[in-house]
């Protein structure tokens, strides 16, 4: 059989020579390999017949080439295949292939003769053993195919398809979708439905009257079967079955209340119908179990249990547990930082918080060189809490620590310890610190630790926080208990350090409290330098970072990153070649006031009111000594509700005097007072101004001690959710009167100022109606310079006319440098 298959391959190769139109193609190489396998088979067949004594075999062996000749042909084929693969075809390749084909054809003829003789010999032996008729019928299909193959080229039959893997084979894709529970449930439902359908088809309920009049009176009843003392089956006799109304039915049934009542009624009915006692209807009593009905009764319970198991597994997987069950929930979800694949952030990428960065870098130094400190008797700090407003760089510092620590770094969110299952949070804390100890020295960073570190409450009878408190207790024990985590540093980040538990903040757990505030001027310069480095700028980074840092007081690091990104987007939207100063100014306005709502069209009357409103703010800010410098006035709607805005530039001030607060309140009331002076009725546009004024006046009275009647007492509310007041009703009345007095004084002062500067208000309002936007330069042209020196040093240093003109010229120079040169052709 093996030699026969080889002969078919050889015949196919010889009868169908390779098309050399695609000489270097894969088809040609496959054909050569087929011929090469033919040589191997021929040599094996030849070596197997070497020791035979039969004369015909010996004669045939003489016709077959010797081993040396076969080996020579083999080497020719190997050389030919190698040349084809390496694309080194000789010039006489046609002649070379012709010789190889002739050699293969000669070998094929010899093998065909040998195989034919072998089959004839086997046929003779079978004829001698079984007779000619049986031997003739036992001729194999292979022999007939072999004999017919000498005259025509018949392709071999296709190989049988591979067997399909069983359903329980893991390699079978169907098995992956098979769920035993689904199969069982489907089978049960189908069985129940089939049983129910069969019951409905076979049964038909009737009443007692129908049984008596239509069946019993007409003699169609063969017997009665009382099932489970509640139902009676009326079995029909042959006469009843053959009736047209009962065709295809074997029985009817009706229900009974009790057996005694049924027997009494049956006896009475038979007496009334004069049925002879020898022909009375026999009654049988049986107990039957309806498995489908029983299964249907327990089906809701089974489905409920299965649903609970399914939901448990799904929630376990969604919560990060392993697929093995809910026991995987106890594993920590902390992720180990990979310095090769994760975001690569170094300490040089962190700016604006130099003091905090030094503290964190010292932790890294502790872990890298512990002997340097231990030889002095110092112990490595256990942990540090990073606190501060959002966007100041707490998480960024942790990322930089992971990038430069050189030790295993694990980071996890505080909310990942909170689960719906009891004990999961504490188990995850144990697993986290166990992993950290095994890989010590290491660093663990817990972001938003206030999710599990809130202060424990006294008298908590509801039990709502028991699970969170258990997680916190486990955290306290792991950080500084009987098994301290030596050489494991814990860093944590939070925006609310005031609500954390005192036991968590004590030395020995979090030894250092690092507060990261919003950056000052120098910090903003450094942050802008980091972000501007990645942008294509039209000006110099040094000049831009100074001006932008002065324009963004109170901005956090995240706000500055957003400004740089928005400026790049605006430049790309405008098809500019580089990011310019005006793009950054637009981005700052977008971050402060929101996007311009150009589609929000104001009526002429509303636009006029907004213009006078903003003109009142601008004039008050221009002539009040302690007001912040005015940068821009606009009546273009921005954000959700602002119909206009005045942009001021406060400095990095840490102390506010009473006069400064009153000047700010007076400036905030300038819009409403301007409406009162120029229109017969006021509008609702000053609602936000009133909130600011009331808040400042209340703080002056209740917190800052700037009221003579209240004095030096702090009545600040402990919490916004606290419904009680820290003062009496009489004190509350005094506070209200003092707040009103301060606001009224500011209002009277603002009214007096705007009446004196009525021409300036009119002038600014008219220009605003025409241009919609006024800059500081426009204000100087209209009103002259401010009568007071600016109290913001950064304003004078980086926002003066000289610096502005310097940046503009630098941008123009770069534009000319980047312009395409005219063609000389």
UniProtKB/Swiss-Prot annotation:
Which stretches are tagged as biased composition: Basic and acidic residues?
Answer: 115-131
Checking CDD domains in the record gives:
RecA-like_FtsH (cd19501)
Q: Return the annotated region ranges for Disordered.
A: 43-67, 115-173, 806-825
What reaction gets catalysed by this protein? ATP + H2O = ADP + phosphate + H(+)
Q: Known consequence of changing residue 448 to Q?
A: Abolished ATPase activity, leading to impaired respiratory growth. Does not affect the protease activity
How its function is modulated: the record gives: ATP hydrolysis is coordinated within m-AAA protease ring complexes: ATP-binding to YTA12/RCA1 inhibits ATP hydrolysis by the neighboring subunit YTA10/AFG3, leading to coordinated ATP hydrolysis within the AAA ATPase ring.
Domain of life per record: Eukaryota
Q: Which ranges are annotated Pro residues under compositional bias?
A: 154-168
Query: For ATP, which residues are the binding ones?
Result: 350-351, 392-396, 531
What keyword terms does UniProt attach to this protein? ATP-binding, Hydrolase, Membrane, Metal-binding, Metalloprotease, Mitochondrion, Mitochondrion inner membrane, Nucleotide-binding, Protease, Transit peptide, Transmembrane, Transmembrane helix, Zinc
* Topology in the lipid bilayer: Multi-pass membrane protein
Q: How is the cofactor bound?
A: Binds 1 zinc ion per subunit.
Q: What else is known?
A: Present with 11500 molecules/cell in log phase SD medium.
Q: This protein is called what?
A: Mitochondrial inner membrane m-AAA protease component YTA12
Q: Which organism is it from?
A: Saccharomyces cerevisiae (strain ATCC 204508 / S288c) (Baker's yeast)
Q: Which gene encodes it?
A: YTA12
